[in-house]
Amino acid sequence: MNEQYKQLGVSDAVLTYGETILASLRERFDAIDAIAEANQLKVINAMQKNRVAANHFNLSTGYGYDDEGRDTLERVYADCFGAEAALVRPQITCGTHALALALGANLLPGDELLSPVGAPYDTLEEVIGIRESVGSLKEHGVSYRQVDLLPDGSFDLDGIRAAINEKTKLVTIQRSKGYATRPSFSVEQIGQLIAFCKRCKPDVICMVDNCYGEFTELTEPVNVGADMMVGSLIKNPGGGLAPTGGYICGRADLIERCARRLTAPGLGREVGANLGLLTSFYQGFFLAPTVVASAVKGAVFAAACYERLGFRVVPPAAETRHDIIQAVELGSREGMIAFCKGIQSAAPVDSYVTPEPSPMPGYDSDVIMAAGAFVQGSSIELSADGPTCPPYAVYFQGGLTWYHAKLGILMSLQKMQEAGLISL
């Protein structure tokens, strides 16, 4: 096997270093596998309960009336995640679209949106109206305020209490760190925050952006009081097979509003053809717990490898995981480029491409991205990216198989060593 690694460009020194790190992670990997097993059984139970059958994979076109496969998939999602209802559609194009849909469906002029966990993803700034944009919530009369986290990364409960007022209609909680170096939140932490917000205003809607977090723990935000939970099918729940799509699940009345926003009042969830994508949606969801476990193992391995070399990693290698993202602060633009070159060179697709920093809409700095994916933009497939500015953090995620994630990390070390940025 060592010879096969050498053929792919991994030196003996890097391979030996990687195996030394791996030997220290056996118990961690066993714990990750235990979570995957429990979540796999949860998915199977939801599929069996809803009597998933071969006819549920049939193509529908046009209006999509009476699409039993689509409707059954939504019941599977709802049951698996512990929600009253779910909307799972290829017409929801990405995570940002799903979030914009959930917000737009449940916020009216005069309402206020609150983020108690600081600034949202950059892509949501135009949705909200933090940056001026046509069609934003701000343009439609929805105000916004945020409460930043405390310096130690904990919730500013006094600030949140002061921010919640009679106009506060919806609280949005971003589970994952995004392009930040704060810790991602556990389901338990999210539950505590939701309970606090509900004590301040019992009728406030609590929505969780669950992107990158599905199946990393035994429970999901809906299980601890979230009224809505939102995510993308080209991330965790699509299992690497879904070619597009997003989901929203939670309270039935809120999900119905989302359905009517997605299509039209009077139509709601009754229309929306599946366009032949249901097999990939069902099979991807079935595989998702195992695929997510592979990605989590890759994140833990990356953290352990780079932490021992003296780099700051978020979360630390020994910390329990709440999403699939691993941030590594490499300290220089050159380090980010070398790391991403390693990830790209390990890809099954476009392995010959050399990633370079380049401008990207919505970002003040050039962004570098490495991804050789079967599905464009898929974050559950092995990838790495980040803005090339201090602290020069690269965000590593994904890996449909653990062995691919392992190769990616070894190749990142190889490129870092060849650039003279690390010594093994």
Across the structure, where does each feature detected by a protein language model lie?
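Active-site-flanking structural segment that lines cofactor/substrate pockets
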Residues: 57-87
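Conserved C-terminal alpha-helix-loop-beta "cap" of PLP-dependent enzymes
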Residues: 307-424
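Short helix-loop-beta junction
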Residues: 79-83, 135-142, 348-349
